[in-house]
């Protein structure tokens, strides 16, 4: 599957420092220390209702990770998937009387357009679940042979992962069993499925049904993969046995990232699967959770159609810390547009305060668990000073613009 078009990222003088990131598994901030190349896997969209602001906020978060890594002198191999076959996609297509493949292709294309507009650095590998099915089926068979997976004895042939085979199950989410049992059905799990060894066992392979798409599965028979194993296999195949960052929204902490880690670790015999499990907060609207069921999603494409500057959208989403659940409202966008206008005027000023001093502090803020609110405040201070004629560094405005572009992804 093709990714989207990238843009040139300006080079800055010197190098940034190591990136400190909050790890959901360790419940604390720790240094991200890739050796030479940073590897990152981010769970992408299920292609319907794209791209809402929750998607955008998550993608901006991991775009910042890429930018800080690159500024520190690292190469980056970034993989993102598209869950282009899943129950919610099929349900939406059936509801709207549309071919699921047409729906998936259209929404994926729209997502790419939005990523270009938001100046998200594209992944090195943008991979659909469908194109990965042969590899996924092979890995599921491996789990069956190693007795870490089993078939339900009800005639369907469905295959489930046995969580008792994963002794560290629960380390990524830090949830107790009762919490898991509560969340599991809310996020795609089926704890009441008869024949499972444990209510929390996740689906690995759904055997073919007469009214559903299916693909050859070798020894599994025809069918389609479960959600969690898709991401585990794509990441393993493209990034290796251990990765530096596994990322997504905080609604993926459990069961998705917990189960993906368990699958990967059983397949490789190595733990932890990721050095950092990094999760972005949810975006609400006017104090309410933004969700498909409430019909209150705000879409990047609609904002663009209303001629909202995508850089203002990006700034608005970065005005809150990536880990916090936060609310979207019109005032945020108005404030972001005013900030963008002010920065653009400052970047066109004849001179300003030392941008190298600004750059050092700017890098420090972003390296501290992606403190974008702190970075925005620093940029505001520099811009305000430049606009009132403080400082005589004639090269400073251009370096300010390059720094904001390279590290925040905001083009002035």
UniProtKB/Swiss-Prot annotation:
GO cellular component: cytosol
Gene Ontology MF, one: cysteine-glucosaminylinositol ligase activity
Domain of life: Bacteria
Keyword Cell cycle: no
Cofactor, how bound (note): Binds 1 zinc ion per subunit.
Keyword Cytoplasm: no
Keywords on record: ATP-binding, Ligase, Metal-binding, Nucleotide-binding, Zinc
Cofactor(s) for this UniProt protein: Zn(2+)
Cross-referenced Gene3D superfamilies: Anticodon-binding domain of a subclass of class I aminoacyl-tRNA synthetases (1.20.120.640), HUPs (3.40.50.620)
Official protein name in the record: L-cysteine:1D-myo-inositol 2-amino-2-deoxy-alpha-D-glucopyranoside ligase
Gene: mshC
